[in-house]
Amino acid sequence: MPNRQASCLSALPHLLNLPAVPIRIPVCSPARRLTMWDRLCSYCSLLKGRATAHNYVALSHLPVARSRASLSIATAACLAVTLIMLARAVRPAETVGQHGVPKAADGSDDGPIHSIVHYVYIKENASSMLQFPFASFLAVFAAAVHLKPTRIYIHTDFNDTEIRDAGARGDRWTRAMVAHSFFKDLVWKQVEVPTYAGQNDEERISAVQHKSDFVRWEAIAPVGGIYLDWDVVPLRPLTPLLNAGFAFVGGRQYGGAAEDGSVNGTINNGAFMTKPNSAMARIVVREQYMQFTNAKWASNLHSVTSIAEHLVAIPTEALILDRTAFAPTHWFKNSADLLFLPNAGPSSPEAVSVNTTDPMELYANDVRNRRRRAGWEMDFSSTYLLHAFSMSQYLDYVNPSTILSRTSNFGIATYDMVRKMQVLGYISATGDDDDDDKPAELLPEHEPPDGE
């Protein structure tokens, strides 16, 4: 009898063209079980067509003589659907894995996160002009060297005419980015910028930073990749993180005393990476409009942090790194001064490199370099991405000559990149390239920098 039951029950989904699911048969007395079984088999026998019947029946009125069969089929279908719903309620196989841990969503693939870099450049107002200081060129150059992206996207609301004008009449580094881009796979992509959010679209999105928050997630969600703010400078390859198997990788950030801890520990929204259509990206895109409020500047940060922290419980969906990974400093003056301002006295000595892959030798060499460094020097050895907050307020100190002098922490962190620019001819051998009006035509055109 058990084999006969299993055979008939397993045939039900096939006959009804329904997905097969495990069916739990309630435990009851033998007599009652036999009665229920006989009824179910009776329904199954009604579903079987005659030997001469065709498999296909046109969607037309059935003869009166077949009304009883139609009623039986409908009744059997209702019974099967009821059994399926009961089975799914008892064992929700799609959402629960071993030991009661939810399984990962189907939206993320099994491969690494794609090395596609995304930037967002949104107008502050209707009269805004497209401009790139040396700091932006440095950030994109470092991304090209360390991350080896297959493509770099700049998502913007500037139109094609405005972009061409900037490439023709902008200052040196603007022309270098637009008209003489060193990275041949840099793509400008026009986007629509939202102006209202909230549960009923009653919240006007005024700040360009908030508009960028919406655009970045909508842009990266379908294709995946690495999102970077313009003040984020990659310091080393992200390959270990891209290949770690997680659908989303983010890092926490520091806050300041004036914020009473409301930002400290939140996910840094200016540097993260995601697979295409990851659960993180889809949920943020779905919920960011409802969660936004102008009354709380950091509402997006809190929403993103809450989503990521909940996804950590789902295997391989989210990895959250500590503060030093992406944001070792913060945007308040006491931290920004330490990062950007030059220090008096001798320059910090250059780090000595060793030609080995042995981790013990590399660690010993790192210890020797740390003992030689200046007393004011920060340790970025555990930093992948340097989110240099408040960079726009310190542009006077973000230039080739200051960086090559090795007298600031930002200069030490980016020294190797600027030296590479010298070797490739992007800046002069003396490093005297602080004049933004210097002709961009002297730069190599469409010659992407090699990796390390």
Kindly label every feature range from the protein language model.
Residues 28, 35-212, 230-452:
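Glycosyltransferase-associated regions of secretory-pathway enzymes
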Residues 1-44:
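N-terminal targeting leaders characterized by basic, low-complexity, disordered sequences
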Residues 213-225:
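Small-residue hinge/turn detector
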